[in-house]
């Protein structure tokens, strides 16, 4: 506990210097008039680029302390490396959690109605924009760079993303979370994506893994809650926070130590702050940029 609370001021400086406060000029009209009860402004009234260095310093202090390590699964599998962050309780990456809690609420809301049991509600989904944000596995490039006025995607031609994204194709769904790989026929949009996509996003036509069972699920043509509220409007559910090793059909939901702050986030905060300093001409220690690129490679390799 002493080690944990010793780092709390550092986390606050990251927030103060980072996007939410350091870049408050982007939301000036929204926040400028927000005040404390004593009349003092709650948010900065003027932009200060030097706060990016404050954020970089705070993040570097955590990184340099070597108290935490990025989580890796026993076999260093890229899918389980990501899934394990929320699956393995009290793992080496967690800095501050909400403690060990039951997963029922978050899991019941994301478990599709195709799964047996009275608590498979399946209506908390992922937006299409979030789906589009995941890079391609082979190139590492982000496929969708924006949208036309009619909502159609602007595709990075070098990403490897299929132009016929809604055409169906055979695909081998990857093995992760204790479940074996399997073949399915799905839209090309959902194929050959970054491992984080499959751990996070559940899409129609794939199988929901729960305990020793794999349940085929579709959100189209009246299947699995299409005519009720118990379905995701976007056609995608959230995979990640459900314990796929537990049998929720029998009321087993598992527990989670929810990662309020984890080392991966600190790495990203540090990288962002260092790059903002570089762009805005803010002086930082000579080793910061090298360290930022080093931890970026660690994240990508993981």
Give the residues covered by each predicted segment:
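Hydrophobic core segments within long, regular secondary-structure runs in both alpha-
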Residues: 1, 21, 49-63, 289, ...
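N-terminal low-complexity segments that are often proline-rich with Ser/Thr-Pro
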Residues: 2-12, 16
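An aromatic- and glycine-enriched ligand-binding surface/loop that stacks and positions planar moieties
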Residues: 24-221
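Surface-exposed helix-capping loop/turn segments at secondary-structure junctions
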Residues: 6, 66-74, 275-282
